[in-house]
A protein has these predicted regions:
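Short beta-strand scaffold segments in enzyme catalytic cores
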Residues: 46-48
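Glyoxalase I/VOC metalloenzyme domain signal
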Residues: 1-8, 13-32, 50-197, 203-295
């Protein structure tokens, strides 16, 4: 069965203090607002919608409720004990049941889809189905199928998609790995996509393989020399470390950030020949945030 995974749906950046996370991403030019609470899960989040995907900043709202729902491991608390950062990449499906069945036929250990939800500050219940990988495939990706239409979800937040930094969509997400060739084979099996060619990433200074998911790309990257990928691995080990956003104006994004106290982002030239700029993790809750687009 052909994969019906459609795109990167969102990234999950986890923070110890949600208000501080909102403030940080507001300084970067995102219109980000409290998204509500995950009922019975002890967590809450803030959301910045783009055209069809979004940014989620999440924190623990009630420690005891979280531990009761997550079990004794308390994975999010363990993650946050090493600092804020990008924890999961969430991939969207149009038919999660079919994708789960297809993954299992490929030998992937994955859960049955389960229903989840979030109550917005206005009391509106948003719903989705989610599937997670098992311990034989401990990758930092989750799978989602939204049950609430995009227009209804966007309507819950003011100025949805109208960001001062001009961001229109997620372009690419980067995951640091110790062995890019081995990781590319594993992600190929999980995603149901061919193994991509390995290339040297000019900005992240890593050997990388890019999986195209609709208009978005999921990249596994092995550090090759000092740079963002190597720094991220030295700081907290392998895992997601960077999000690249496509903006309508690089200069407009830079001006907003300068006006809000963010130092000028480093600039570089991507493999595509495009100019990109990169905000370091100390200004983005432990995550590299990149921008690419016209001046």
């Amino acid at each position: 069965m052909q994969s019906v995974l459609t795109r990167i749906d969102h990234v999950m950046i986890c923070v110890a203090n949600l208000e501080e996370g909102i403030e940080a991403y507001t300084r970067l030019g995102f219109n980000i607002y409290p998204g509500g609470v995950h009922t019975g899960r002890g967590t809450h989040n803030a959301i910045a919608y783009h055209e069809e995907d979004y940014l989620e900043v999440m924190g623990v709202r009630d420690r005891q409720e979280y531990l009761s729902s997550a079990g004794p491991g308390g994975g999010l608390l363990e993650f946050l004990s090493h600092g804020n950062g990008l924890r999961f990449v969430i991939v969207q499906s149009d038919d999660l049941g079919a994708d789960v069945a297809a993954m299992r036929r490929r030998g992937v250990e994955v859960s049955e889809p389960s229903t989840g939800g979030r109550r917005t500050p206005a009391g509106y219940e948003l719903q989705w189905k989610m599937a997670v990988l098992g311990p034989d495939h401990p990758l930092p990706i989750l799978f989602i199928q939204h049950l609430t239409p995009l227009a209804e979800r966007r309507a819950q937040l003011p100025q949805a998609g109208n960001h001062p930094n001009g961001v229109r969509r997620t372009d690419r997400v980067y995951i640091a790995v110790p062995d890019v060739a081995a990781a590319a084979k594993t992600y190929s099996q999980v995603l149901g996509l061919p193994v991509p060619p390995i290339q040297r990433g000019a900005v992240i200074k890593a050997d990388m393989a890019v999986f195209d998911l609709g208009p978005t790309g999921l990249t596994v990257a092995q550090p090759a020399e000092p740079g963002p990928a190597a720094e991220a691995v030295s700081r907290r080990g392998p895992g997601p470390f960077q999000v690249l956003y496509r903006t309508s104006s690089m200069d407009g994004a830079a001006r907003w950030m300068a006006d809000h106290g963010v130092p000028p982002p480093a600039r570089g030239v991507r493999n595509t020949g495009e100019q990109a700029m990169l905000v370091p993790p100390e200004h983005a809750c432990g995550t590299y945030i990149g921008f690419v687009g016209p001046a």
